[in-house]
Amino acid sequence: PGSAATISVRGIGSISASRSPLIIVDGVPYEGSLNSINNADIESMTVLKDAAANSLYGARGANGVVMITTKKGTNGKTAVSLDAKWGANSRGVKAYKTIRNAGEYYEMFWEALKNANMNIGGMSSAEAAINASQNLVPTLGGYNAYNVDNALLIDPVSGYLNPNAQLLYNEDWQEDPFKNGLRQEYNLSIKGGTEKTSFYASLNFLDDNSYLRNSNFKRYTGRLKLDHQVNDWLKTGFNMAYAQTNTNSPNVGGSNYSSLFYFGQNIAPIYPIYRYDRTGQPILDATGAPAYDYGVTEGHERPYGANANPYAQLMNDIREYTYDIVSAKAYAEVKFLKDFKFTLNLSADNFGYTGVDFQTPIGGDALNVNGRSYRTTQRYFALNTNQLLTYEKTIGDHRFDVLLGHEVKADKKTYLQAMKEQFLIPDNPELSNGAALKDATSYTSEYRLEGFFSRIQYDYKDRYYLTGSYRRDASSRFHPDNRWGNFWSVGASWRISEESFLRDVKAINTLKLKASYGTQGNDALGNDTPYLDQYTVVPQDGAIGITYDWRGNKDLTWEKSNNFNAGIEFGFWDIVSGNVEYFIKETKDLLYYKSMPPSAGLPNIIAVNDMSMKNSGIEAEVEVKIINTNNIKWNVSANITKYKNEVTKLREHIRAMGE
């Protein structure tokens, strides 16, 4: 629980660079993930998809924009709200159908041994059956889950389980690690204000217990928002939020013996989670607790997953991750010369992260090194500021909206990680408890982005709309010769429902045709200085050496996308509303890690802009107001998207190499 959602807007935006949309909270970029925002603080959320809507956000809006507006205070009586929510988490996709009965497994394995004795060993049917009964348990590593002798477990005449056999243990690898988890959330908010000042404050606590044992997510959030109208021409405000998330996240993914899902699907039901003696009594460890079975004990040698027990690792390994997030925003709006407004926005996000990844010395992945622990700390600070100058003018039926802006982003990341092995106390993950330092590393990276942008919007009689925008961005991730990128967009829409021939049709609330085209860039390449050669300092026979880790490429530049969008918005009878849109997104200069010839040495890859990709498709959404009264409101909405992704230039490149 607590994992950040993967958000894709209209398909895959990139191959090697970031595919995540930009998150905007109250008008400024937010560097965190959505799971750190209290849902109860959100007033509205909108997803911007086409180039005309995203153009003002430049390179960071290449994969779409998620616009979030938080709640604010209102003029009037102070209101206090408290709500509590409870729920349950359970496994949604049940385990695949496999043999989960020990007796059935013994019978099937016995049949396989008998057939092998006849087909490979050349034995008669009777000889093969007796041999299979005698070697069944030894072949399975000495594991006998029943209270009869090994050779008597399967009747060699019938091939069935001995009717006198009684099960000594019955553990299910596909069920025992899971449970029903309680989810509880509490929200407290207060809002109010006067004619000039409004305020909103909230506190939130979320405790989300997973359906997997020893796995949970906790979140604490607080928010304070204040807006103040100083006088007729000046308005100011600030918005401060704090969030802490604590995640206990065991290893469950992948296709290895540490994964509960993989291990549980593949291990036979005759192998227990805990150790048992021949009477079926649990064997206790030194602490008096039931001892886990790792498949290698006296008289037992499990042929599958020896030294592995992912359930034991689930309960004994420690994987705890904590984020502390402080976000602050301040703004000032100045109105002057009647039609002009200047807005200054300043936001700062400060992220602190600590992580513990401890693998127990009792058994599992770190058994051979007597335990292993990684400790990680990371600090990320991002500063965003923009200055906006707007001019709004209405002349008769003509309305103009002109925007000029400047934006700067600066961030700094510091990272420190150390790893030790050979731990004295088996449940203490602190590095001071480990004897052997195996790895320690740290780095600091910085990133700068600057942009100048403009937008012109025009409409005539609230019927015909035109918009155009231009933005010029510079990114520190590129060589100075390729640092600047130019991006633009144009759009138009026609509100047909305002035409004289439709204006009096009561069934039609709105009907609008729209189209846009524009270009955008993406600089989120995963490396803050990819145009520079990068090295790591290493020990070399008692001296200082370096390794060549990254082959720089000063010709790297922006990933560029051309976006076309056309659609229709509709609303009928004050009940049904929605839209249908067709889109094409063609991206060129995609980042690609190109293999180098052996003669070039190491590193044997280099990052280049050498791919192209196309996303095209159609999406539709509809909302129906089933009940819309003062006391009851019931809306139902649905959406569907169908798109095709095509990597165009890569196929030509592979064909040219004959692959």
Sequence positions of predicted segments:
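Short, T/G/N/S-enriched strand-turn elements that build extracellular solenoid repeat scaffolds
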Residues: L34-N35, L650
